[in-house]
Amino acid sequence: IQLAGYYCYYEDPNPDAEYWYTQLLADAVPLAARLGVVMGIENVDGDDVTSLTKAMEFVDAVDSPYLQLYPDLGNIAEQGLDPGVELAAGRGHMVAMHAKDVRPGEPRRVEMGAGVVDWDRSFELLAAQGWSGRLMIEMWNDDVPDSLSRCAVARTFIEGRAASAGIAIVAP
């Protein structure tokens, strides 16, 4: 299950929000374990859990195989972070991944390949780690009439980049 790394989304966070976020993660682990569900913290845009380095603080604090990472490659780029540093921080803990393109200050609605994500480097780093897992393409097409064709183009783009780096693509 993907857990967004926002302490609060629609309102200003409480000064103790990080503490409560940690407590809620720890409280969720026994249920996740009982149900056999792995939770993954997504690094997000904004000011909360914006990096895999930060997300690993929660993973380490809770210390359960049922709490891991769900990286968003676009959010790494949008935050201006180094994918080499971030993906190394998450090594062995990345259970699934988001692929979306971004521009600085524009974390949504950027056409795949038109933003600043260094896809080749990111996928090469993941391949070097031997990473495999679910790779979801995050799209923000809202109500545009050609949403399906945009999704198909994005999928072809991402599959091509991942395959070029040596990441096996298995069709659903």
Residue ranges and their predicted role:
Residues 72:
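Active-site glycine-centered loops adjacent to acidic/histidine catalytic or metal-binding residues
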Residues 139, 168-172:
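Short, flexible loop/turn segments with low-complexity composition
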Residues 48, 52-56, 60, 75-132, ...:
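Gly/Pro-rich active-site loop or hairpin
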Residues 147-168:
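C-terminal helical cap(s) of enzyme catalytic domains, especially alpha/beta-barrels
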Residues 34-35, 65, 129-131, 165:
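Helix C-cap/helix->beta junction micro-motif
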Residues 1-69, 78, 149, 171:
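Active-site acidic/histidine proton-transfer and metal-coordination neighborhood
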